[in-house]
């Protein structure tokens, strides 16, 4: 398993670009920024507390319902301009080798996205945070959090100077 682990690249990053969705770039006519923070639980559906026990296997193994759940999430995300994702999978066995941040960026027609791989367990699991945006970030910074390894924060900046917007995405668990 050690051979699958990759070094985390801390520091400044450029967003990934969905060339097909650059027309969806920018704010709507009312100039309001619509924000969403969403813990997607790797695309698992949880309707009651007992599902954390009875469906816990879905955090490790693939299952049929995940693709449909991701499509529903993608439809929901399309109503927002900036989305913070927690508990996304970066493309391991449990997600059917689908990078869920990239997939949701495509489904929601976001021109810009970034995936922060926090805990790389290779083919088994790739625990990630993500950012989806209709605005091009001027800077994206990846920061490890103190404490146990495998946690991080993404600092996303829009603009420069005193009117710049800074958004921090993280998952504390």
Predicted regions and their residues:
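Short beta-strands and strand-loop turn motifs
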Residues: 84-87, 114, 168-170
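Conserved beta strand-loop-helix elements of the APE1-like EEP
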Residues: 106-108, 123-140
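Beta-strand-turn-beta hairpins that frame and shape the catalytic cleft
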Residues: 24-35, 133-138, 149-169
């Amino acid at each position: 398993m050690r051979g699958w682990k990759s070094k985390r690249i801390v520091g400044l990053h450029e967003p990934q670009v969905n060339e097909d969705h650059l027309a969806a770039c920018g704010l709507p006519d009312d100039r309001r920024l619509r924000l969403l923070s969403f813990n997607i639980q790797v695309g698992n559906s949880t309707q009651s507390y007992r599902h954390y026990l009875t469906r816990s296997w879905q955090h490790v193994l693939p299952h049929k319902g995940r693709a449909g759940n991701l499509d529903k999430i993608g439809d929901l995300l399309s109503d927002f301009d900036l989305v913070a994702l927690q508990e996304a999978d970066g493309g391991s066995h449990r997600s059917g080798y689908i990078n869920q941040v990239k997939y949701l960026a495509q489904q929601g027609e976001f021109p810009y996205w970034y995936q922060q791989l926090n805990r790389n367990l290779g083919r088994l699991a790739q625990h990630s945070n993500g950012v989806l945006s209709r605005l091009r970030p001027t800077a994206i910074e990846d920061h490890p959090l103190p404490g146990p390894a495998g946690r991080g924060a993404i600092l996303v900046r829009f603009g420069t100077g005193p009117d710049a917007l800074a958004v921090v995405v993280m998952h504390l668990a």
